[in-house]
A protein has these predicted regions:
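Short glycine/proline- and charge-enriched loop/turn segments
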Residues: 1-4, 101-107
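Contiguous beta-strand/loop segments that form the cofactor/metal-binding neighborhood of enzyme cores
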Residues: 17-92, 112, 122-134, 168-169
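A short glycine-threonine-serine/GTX helix/turn-capping micro-motif
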Residues: 4-11, 108-116
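Short polybasic amphipathic segments
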Residues: 74, 92-104
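Mid-domain beta-loop-alpha active-site segment that forms a flexible
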Residues: 1-28, 142
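C-terminal helix-rich "cap/oligomerization" subdomain common to oxidoreductases
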Residues: 55, 109-110, 126-169
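Soluble or luminal CAZymes and related metallo-dependent hydrolases
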Residues: 13, 117, 145
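Alpha-helical packing segments of well-folded alpha/beta enzyme cores
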Residues: 17, 121, 146-150
Length: 169
């Protein structure tokens, strides 16, 4: 690992569940608490544990690490049941994803047909260039909001405290 290259687990893998939480809850977090494990030799963050606090008492928490078994799973738990998705990222284009839905009456697994998600991302990006504002996302606003949360994570780890996203300009 090389700190001068700007990597680290927060940038390399933590960005995905941060973005997914924002998408799933269709809102921005009010604040974060982040704990990074820094490699003593390289000074690069190799593990991250993060709690994001959204409105309406909604929370998102996750852990990522270079030396952890690869899982890439999501779980959502609510008062009426739960959803879980296996192999959410970096899924081979021929592998189906599995969505599990559970509550007191249902225990169902839905196979999601394989798709090349990298191809879909590139196509969406190219389509936005060719036909501006054709995508449901405002890419510029989304990137700025994501950067704000990532910065709040870094400050939270450095200062060992909960950081409200409104603190970040």
């Amino acid at each position: 690992y090389d700190k001068s290259l700007g990597g680290g687990i927060l940038n390399d893998a933590g960005c995905y569940p941060i973005n997914a939480s924002r998408m799933l809850f269709d809102s921005e977090p009010r604040g974060v608490f982040c704990n990074l494990t820094i490699d003593k030799e390289t000074q690069v963050d190799t593990k991250a544990t993060l709690l994001m606090d959204f409105n309406d008492n909604i929370k998102s928490q996750f852990s990522v690490g270079y030396d952890l078994d690869y899982q890439s799973n999501y779980g959502l738990w609510g008062s009426d049941g739960s959803l879980s998705l296996t192999r959410s990222y970096n899924i081979p284009p021929d592998m189906p994803a599995r969505l599990n839905i559970k509550n007191s009456n249902i225990d169902e697994e839905i196979l999601i047909e394989p798709v090349n998600h990298f191809q879909l991302m590139v196509e969406s990006f190219c389509n936005e260039i060719m036909k501006p504002n054709s995508c449901i996302y405002n890419f510029e606003e989304d990137l700025l909001n994501q950067a704000k949360i990532m910065e709040a994570c870094r400050i939270s780890d450095k200062e060992k405290r909960y950081v409200e996203t409104r603190e970040i300009e």
